[in-house]
Regions:
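Histidine-centered active-site/metal-ligand motif
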Residues: 4-9, 65, 125, 183
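Generic low-polarity alpha-helical segments
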Residues: 19-20, 43, 96-99, 191
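Active-site HxH/HxHxD metal-binding segment of metal-dependent hydrolases
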Residues: 1-51, 144
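Residue-level signal for well-ordered alpha-helical segments
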Residues: 27-29, 34-39, 62, 81-88, ...
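Short C-terminal domain-edge/linker segments immediately following a structured domain
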Residues: 3-5, 9, 30-35, 49-52, ...
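Accessory terminal helices/loops
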Residues: 109-197
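Metallo-beta-lactamase
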Residues: 58-63, 67-146
Length: 197
């Protein structure tokens, strides 16, 4: 089960006969499949229950880091697997196909509707998050960015041949994460921070 189609998450697919991936991830996955010999993939949609052999998880749609990202809810052990959708240090929204901050906020609010069903989040690259209220901190960061809060220029990042201008926002004291997001024109949030103009 792939949370999204980035190479660092689908590389092991060559060892399986079939994989599952979100529908909006399929074009990226198929391109990688041609180059890397990945297995065939079936579409997974929100609400699908996946039997992993003695363990079941439910797919939850999460456009953010990628447009077709999914999280997986393990109700029995009260774990939300987030892949790269929610990380413990930095959430990357600057990738070539990442969604805008406004869409990320909607996805976080959507994920929050399951909050009573998990006690911690298991991420794709960082430590586990043992307080689901962390999602509220990320929603607050999205709100601050969308209302012109103080963002700092991150600089230009080159990823997979694309050069992207990025900014980051780190919240108030106690905020555990940083949102790194693409600069979209017009960069209205720069108005709050003259150092970014």
């Amino acid at each position: 089960v792939n949370t999204h189609a980035h190479r660092d998450h689908v590389g092991g697919n060559r060892y399986f006969e079939r994989a599952l991936i979100g529908e909006a991830e399929l074009p990226v996955y198929l391109d990688g499949r041609k180059k890397n010999g990945f297995c065939e993939a079936d579409i997974i949609r929100e609400g699908d229950i996946i039997d992993l052999g003695g363990k079941t998880v439910e797919a939850i749609s999460f456009p953010g880091h990628t447009p077709g990202g999914i999280c997986l809810l393990d109700r029995a052990d009260r774990i939300m697997f987030t892949g790269d959708s929610v990380l413990g240090r930095t959430v990357w929204l600057f990738m070539p196909n990442s969604v805008p901050v406004s869409e990320m906020k909607k996805s976080l609010e959507h994920l929050n509707t399951w909050r009573s069903e998990f006690d911690w989040l298991l991420t794709g690259h960082s430590r586990k998050i043992d307080d689901p209220r962390y999602i509220d901190e990320l929603i607050g960061a999205c709100d601050a960015i969308l209302t012109g809060g103080p963002a700092e220029r991150f600089g230009q990042v080159e990823i997979w041949g694309d050069k992207l201008d990025c900014c980051y926002y780190t919240g108030e004291d106690g905020m555990q994460s940083t949102l790194v997001f693409r600069v979209l024109c017009p960069p209205v949030f720069w108005l709050a921070s003259p150092s970014l103009t």
